């Protein structure tokens, strides 16, 4: 066993002595040592319950004849961090999480790992670590939150609360109505109830094969989560015995299938960023062109909030992720069904018994929302290396209008609230990319303000930053190269006409090449917003969004 490095041989007497101080007995040194990578954090509702959850995981590991050791990672709640400097720490926290898991697991020579993530950057951070460490691993997330209901019986979620702020600001609802939405938008523990980033990544984790069937959709408060825990411990033991590791599971074909589900469900645009980062950790050459190819061949079968009023509980009731995959498998060339997963079985075997139980929630191949996926990659003179739009969350497929330019999210939000944005405008928020932000903050507050003011279909928004999975409307993010790297978005001027064509996958500014070249020569890189601490280091090392915004090793030659 891998853990023999710290427990076998006369020279490991000091190690065993220390381990006995934690409660181990001599007989435990013949069993696999399992890292329980938890993320219990009281300020994050998606993680509030994970303390008790972790205890259940440890019990299941012991029952399977292995020895559990629990530790916790940090985490950032994107909703609470939204709209202030806290959001700059969100994406960078993914790297800290990956590094911290790598540190604990490699320092102590564990034989296997069970990861307990749930919310936005915590799931991909742990997934990156699992691929980097590459020991047998199973993921069991904390599960989605249920949707809420206002006193009037209206179904609401966190997206409703953010949009309620814009609606109140524009006089569409009263303060009492906003308070009602606030009180009921997040009714329980769990990851926010729509197809936002957390749930998108937990669903993708299931498709990739790192998590068990049901992981993406079974609610946090559902007793079936406990059954998943028991299965996870049993399956991990099999993975250890068969020496099946994350890099055996997460192949290019597995990533294709993850994006196929993403397209079928119209997941968060953040999935593109995180899954590209996973590919980097797995040593795979996977780019946005391949994502676009997946988008072109996968129909959009399922709309979940913010694209509709359906939530993860409805997906679960309708058959879960397995039912969506089973339907997709009917179309040739969409899924790779014979690859191995964390169950020890193939994807084909995992979904064999699945079926759609509600065709209003999960559409059939014969009745898709659209013939192509719910996410699309746009390119053009404004995004040479690509940009992303959640096409399934807007009915507008072509938009052209003059730019209203803001050089930060704070500046943009103030401008929107002051009425500086009108019907037909293209709002540009730049210098908010991985390097420029720094940290590539999410733009949920501006998009929600626009939607709440009733302009969601009449105003477009472009940014080199990110969008929350709760964002909707004509929102194009991840524009690469970013402004801080001298990308074309930095060269835009007030009033420039920008064209967004979702069907043709184009993002262009109606300015001549000669004029753009002239502006580029005159452009000067602004001073970094942050020069010290973790964010200062991050800004110097982070790569572009089109490569996953991962950290690069500085070249000292």
Curated annotation (Swiss-Prot):
SUPFAM superfamilies: IlvD/EDD N-terminal domain-like (SSF143975), LeuD/IlvD-like (SSF52016). It catalyses: (2R)-2,3-dihydroxy-3-methylbutanoate = 3-methyl-2-oxobutanoate + H2O; (2R,3R)-2,3-dihydroxy-3-methylpentanoate = (S)-3-methyl-2-oxopentanoate + H2O. One of its GO terms (molecular function) is 2 iron, 2 sulfur cluster binding. The keyword Manganese does not apply. The modification N6-carboxylysine is found at residue 121. Its EC number is 4.2.1.9. Gene3D superfamilies: IlvD/EDD C-terminal domain-like. It comes from Bacillus cereus (strain B4264). Pathway: Amino-acid biosynthesis; L-isoleucine biosynthesis; L-isoleucine from 2-oxobutanoate: step 3/4; Amino-acid biosynthesis; L-valine biosynthesis; L-valine from pyruvate: step 3/4. Binds 1 [2Fe-2S] cluster per subunit. This cluster acts as a Lewis acid cofactor. This is Dihydroxy-acid dehydratase. GO terms for cellular component: cytosol. Its cofactor is [2Fe-2S] cluster; Mg(2+). Functions in the biosynthesis of branched-chain amino acids. Catalyzes the dehydration of (2R,3R)-2,3-dihydroxy-3-methylpentanoate (2,3-dihydroxy-3-methylvalerate) into 2-oxo-3-methylpentanoate (2-oxo-3-methylvalerate) and of (2R)-2,3-dihydroxy-3-methylbutanoate (2,3-dihydroxyisovalerate) into 2-oxo-3-methylbutanoate (2-oxoisovalerate), the penultimate precursor to L-isoleucine and L-valine, respectively. InterPro entries: Dihydro-acid_dehy_C, DihydroxyA_deHydtase, DiOHA_6PGluconate_deHydtase_CS, ILV_EDD_C, ILV_EDD_N, IlvD/EDD_N.
């Amino acid at each position: 066993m891998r853990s023999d490095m710290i427990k076998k041989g006369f020279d490991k007497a000091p190690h065993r002595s220390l381990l006995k101080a934690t409660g181990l007995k001599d007989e435990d040194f013949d069993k696999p040592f399992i890292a329980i990578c938890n993320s219990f954090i009281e300020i994050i509702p998606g993680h509030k319950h994970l303390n008790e959850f972790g205890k259940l995981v440890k019990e299941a590991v012991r029952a399977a004849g292995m020895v559990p050791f629990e530790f916790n990672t940090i985490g950032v709640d994107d909703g609470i961090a939204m709209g202030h400097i806290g959001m700059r720490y969100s994406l960078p926290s993914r790297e800290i999480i990956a590094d911290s898991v790598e540190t604990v697991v490699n320092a102590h020579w564990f034989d296997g790992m069970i990861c307990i993530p749930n919310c936005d950057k915590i799931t991909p951070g742990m997934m990156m670590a699992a691929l980097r460490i590459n020991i047998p691993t199973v993921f069991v997330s904390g599960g989605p939150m249920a949707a809420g209901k206002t006193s009037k019986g209206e179904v609401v979620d966190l997206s409703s609360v953010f949009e309620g702020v814009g609606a109140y600001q524009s006089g569409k609802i009263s303060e009492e109505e906003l308070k009602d939405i606030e009180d009921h938008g997040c009714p329980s523990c769990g990851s926010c109830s729509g197809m936002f980033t957390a749930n998108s990544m937990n669903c993708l984790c299931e498709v990739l094969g790192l998590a068990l069937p049901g992981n993406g959709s079974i609610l946090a408060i559902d007793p079936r989560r406990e059954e998943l825990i028991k299965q996870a411990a049993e399956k991990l033991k099999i993975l250890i015995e068969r020496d099946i590791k994350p890099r055996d599971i997460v192949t290019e074909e597995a990533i294709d299938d993850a994006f196929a589900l993403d397209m079928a469900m119209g997941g968060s645009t953040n999935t593109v960023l995180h899954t590209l980062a996973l590919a980097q950790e797995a040593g795979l050459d996977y780019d946005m062109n391949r994502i676009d190819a997946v988008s072109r061949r996968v129909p959009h079968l399922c709309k979940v909030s913010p694209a509709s009023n359906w939530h993860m509980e409805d997906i679960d009731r309708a058959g879960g992720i397995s039912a969506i995959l089973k339907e997709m498998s009917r179309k040739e060339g969409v899924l790779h069904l014979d690859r191995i997963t964390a169950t020890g079985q193939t994807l084909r075997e995992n979904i064999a018994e699945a079926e759609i139980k509600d065709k209003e929630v999960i559409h059939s191949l014969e009745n898709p929302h659209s013939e192509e996926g719910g996410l699309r990659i746009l390119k053009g003179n404004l995004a040479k290396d690509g940009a992303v739009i959640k096409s399934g969350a807007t009915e507008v497929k072509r938009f052209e209008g003059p730019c209203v330019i803001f050089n930060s999210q704070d500046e943009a939000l103030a401008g929107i609230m002051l009425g500086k944005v009108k019907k037909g405008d293209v709002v540009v928020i730049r210098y908010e990319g991985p390097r420029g932000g720094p940290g590539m903050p999410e733009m949920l507050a501006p998009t929600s303000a626009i939607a709440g003011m009733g302009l969601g279909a009449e105003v477009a928004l472009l940014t080199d930053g990110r969008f929350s999975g709760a964002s909707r409307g004509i929102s194009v993010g991840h524009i690469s190269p970013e402004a801080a790297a001298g990308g074309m978005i930095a060269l835009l001027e007030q009033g420039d006409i920008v064209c967004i064509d979702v069907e043709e996958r184009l993002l262009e500014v109606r300015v001549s090449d000669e004029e753009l070249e002239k502006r580029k020569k005159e452009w000067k890189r602004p001073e970094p917003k942050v020069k010290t601490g973790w964010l200062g280091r991050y800004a110097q090392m982070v790569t572009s969004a089109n490569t996953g915004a991962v950290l690069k090793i500085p070249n000292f030659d």
